[in-house]
């Protein structure tokens, strides 16, 4: 008989099953001989297969001489022994996936084989072990091994088991077993594929390709053919480097490629679609050129890859890392790459084979696309593979992930290849606990089937029944034990589910309790927000615990020794601002009959107006009041015993009536009766700006009735003497007096002064006065408020701390002009007058730059300022700074690296030696200090609020480089923008973040203390002092930004607050603003003084030259330079007042009137 071919596995299987052939030494097929002594001498050395076949033949010969029953029993025994011996795992079986199929000797089943078999099996095992040990290095060298499996796995060699080929056979009862059919096929059992040696049933391809260790295929011809096969380019290169550089520069990254939207035009490339990005095209072209820039850096490993992802995957073969874990909960497998994990999940945890061969006549289906590709290459050839590659089916490259529609494993002995392809059973997705219960039930069912199978086979192996009873008893005991274990597991899962449900309910209750606690804390914080408006913005702290304060004064005193709470101006990141309505209800005699604060929904008694003298009488002594539970810094002196009854009354009980009936001081001009309120609503009123154009030293140039107080809001402020600090509250009705809703949202100045005196805090007075400047648009009402503060400070002889003082009336007047004149900062350059005022500084700059031969170019244009050309022509005949000095400063105007600013910060055309730089430096310092006090991270405040240039807000200023430069030198605050957004920030989390940030700030402060130099006026002299610059507490920029977007009134107040600090600093330090000068003379000399100081600091001029230039400036101004440079400042100019906007505070009935108002001489206070 002719030996069958090795390429016909079905014939090999059938022949091996019949026992007709046995493989000898892996070379040919021979007829097995009988195991007798005479023939075995001339036979080849006994191998594992020959020994088993010889044992079977010897058993057959021995049973011929016995009884038929004994013959049948011995036949069953020999067949059973062969089955269990062939079921042992092969030598390549790993520890990770152990498969143990041993005969159930422990169940009581005896193995009483024939004497010949018992004697031959040990003899066959000895040469088998020798053959396995000797053939192991050869097999290891013939098969490419994976380093990862070599390190993480251990090869187990079974000495009594031959290396045989296994396949799956289905028994009549439905279980799957393994039988030997030859060599070199790995075991697949229990639904898990142990593996297959490379090269099995594979023919070598006609067009060899380079296959990477992870499936990346590149043409091998690319490594030898160094020809650029791009469209219309066939250049040949001597090395790969030249080819790669040519393709990248000339084709991939060329200008023409942008027009083609990243398309590969390599000859023969089947990529018909464009790439979304350039890097994708670069990686793709490496498949054509053969470039592999990613090399393994491990010693002795020369692997190279074209993709960085493949190199990272390859590195895991050295490190043993397996980050890709199986996504099924009951599987603990892990892999080094996602592809192997997907193959494992599709093959092990699913019976589906969605990848079917599309070639006609082939019905093969596979679980993953790589197996399908290998099948097409090995079986159908390279031509069919190329065709299939070009016509990919829709599901060709889809990675199959665990699908809830896939049925669970149906049997512990099942195999995925036994299920029919393209079967999708309509089952719903079970829950997690339901799925676990199903798996336990199925496992128990299959265990029962296995026990029953062993019990049935025990009867066949022991016909006499000697071991059947023992096997049945052992099977029942094992079944009962297994059932008990599964039941315990089910109970544990049920208890776990109940615990999870209880935790969810407890979490809901905790959230509700936390919400209630936060609401109570917010109410307490709102009660304390008034002090924060007038305090120096102390460090932030967590919310207070809920408690009921006895009264506000004692609570505020207690706050001196406890961490302060967030205030309204601080814009806390976790507590939204809720305006409160503080009010002091009064009786006719001025005594307090209720609490000092009340919430908006509580109606209080209306204050009563009483007329009293305009000043506080000095003959009325007021006994000091000892605060409740006095604490640091200093307790007031205790009053005499006779005045204890009076100590409970407010210290300024007559001051409220004084404010309600205050009259104009004698220094003011007589006033006209106040206008009646019009029908203007709050929204209309807030959208207008009171344009009281006032120059320094003059009175209000009122354009309505000549009174200077025509606003209903001004009337209310003037009549009631109140200061609004609680924010805007929607009011639908008119506000004709200080009663009703008006009194609900006002805070009496007497209460402010009382708190300032009780705590000896001068910042309360100054901040309240600054707030009054913003909220009081009428200058007359503002004067009433200022006189009240001044009289009380003089009467009480209030002592301010170092560097603080009560502002003078000219300073208050100037700041009031900034915010209540016609200069509207939300509409930059809205009118001709505004544009003229802004041009005062720039015309001076252009005048200094008017020497065109040196290269100075003007900044302003004709469209920007229609009087520019005339002023330049008229001012070109005058000189302020010597020509040679201007020449020396020309080079430094655009190159000032030594001043800490880059060139982008300097204004083009500015040739004054850094005048603008000096002014902007001071503005930035003050602006940052104001932003820190407002708890804002200033590097991003300009983006969130609009750039606050010069203190006027919403300006188009390009000087952002200084902010970036300063940002690098500033302590970084807590920034939550990159962290996960949490809806509710608990007090514990906030405290941890706050303490960590505070520790960092303190450490930075100890290393690099920041010092600021400020000036103040004391007794008519300018005094400089130095103090440590305190750091602001950490703040969440994200929350601040969202709050400013949700509440526009906060943004408006913040811009006013920042602008106030900038202008106040300019006033105190005599720094002129480039947007507005108080008067032309002071502006002219101020700029010249700054220029001389800058030149003197840089060493460009001496003291003598500085004095000479000062005389030159005085001489130039005396030559009527002002009339030539700024002709529109002359009041005799016809068009100067014609373009002024009419006051928005006039009556609505006069809105259509176009008559020019009468010109009146400004009054001076």
UniProtKB/Swiss-Prot annotation:
Transmembrane segments: none annotated. GO terms for biological process: cell differentiation; central nervous system development; female germ-line sex determination; female somatic sex determination; negative regulation of transcription by RNA polymerase II; positive regulation of transcription by RNA polymerase II; sex differentiation; spermatogenesis. Gene3D superfamilies: Classic Zinc Finger. GO terms for cellular component: cytoplasm; nucleus. Signal peptide: none annotated. Residues 132-145, 705-721 have a biased composition (Low complexity). Residues 61-74, 379-388, 1147-1158 have a biased composition (Basic and acidic residues). Disruption phenotype: Null mutants exhibit strong masculinization and male mating behavior. XX male mutants are infertile, produce sperm from day one of adulthood, but by day three of adulthood, switch from spermatogenesis to oogenesis and produce irregular oocytes. Mutants display early somatic gonad precursor lineage defects, whereby Z1 precursors divide with reverse polarity and Z4 precursors migrate prematurely. Most animals rectify these defects to produce normal male somatic gonad. Keywords: Cytoplasm, Developmental protein, Differentiation, DNA-binding, Metal-binding, Nucleus, Repeat, Sexual differentiation, Spermatogenesis, Zinc, Zinc-finger. Residues 75-96, 104-120, 729-740 have a biased composition (Polar residues). It comes from the Eukaryota. Its main location: nucleus. Interacts with the MX regulatory domain of tra-2. Belongs to the GLI C2H2-type zinc-finger protein family. Plays a major role in controlling sexual phenotype. Terminal global regulator in a well-characterized cascade of sex-determining genes. Promotes female development. Interacts with tra-2 to promote spermatogenesis. Promotes spermatogenesis through the Tip60 HAT complex and by regulating the expression of genes, such as fog-3, required for male development. Association with chromatin and at the fog-3 promoter requires wdr-5.1, and may also require wdr-5.2. With trr-1, activates the fog-3 gene to determine sperm/oocyte cell fate. Only isoform a is thought to bind DNA. Zinc fingers 3, 4 and 5 are the most important for DNA binding; removal of finger 5 almost abolishes DNA binding and prevents the selection of binding sites. This is Sex-determining transformer protein 1.
